[in-house]
């Protein structure tokens, strides 16, 4: 079974980018509430 590196990279980016974006927004809101 051959692994499609481009599909794997696209999937990883599709998951990592929104997650890190939400994480940054959450940290900013949590720090401003202090």
Swiss-Prot record:
- Enumerate the Gene Ontology biological process terms: photosynthesis, light reaction
> Which keywords has UniProt assigned to this entry?
Chloroplast, Membrane, Photosynthesis, Photosystem II, Plastid, Reaction center, Thylakoid, Transmembrane, Transmembrane helix
Q: Does the keyword Magnesium apply?
A: no
Q: Name one GO cellular component term.
A: photosystem II
Q: Spell out the family assignment given in the record's similarity comment.
A: Belongs to the PsbM family.
Q: Quaternary structure?
A: PSII is composed of 1 copy each of membrane proteins PsbA, PsbB, PsbC, PsbD, PsbE, PsbF, PsbH, PsbI, PsbJ, PsbK, PsbL, PsbM, PsbT, PsbX, PsbY, PsbZ, Psb30/Ycf12, at least 3 peripheral proteins of the oxygen-evolving complex and a large number of cofactors. It forms dimeric complexes.
Tell me what this protein is called.
Photosystem II reaction center protein M
Q: Which organism is it from?
A: Chlamydomonas reinhardtii (Chlamydomonas smithii)
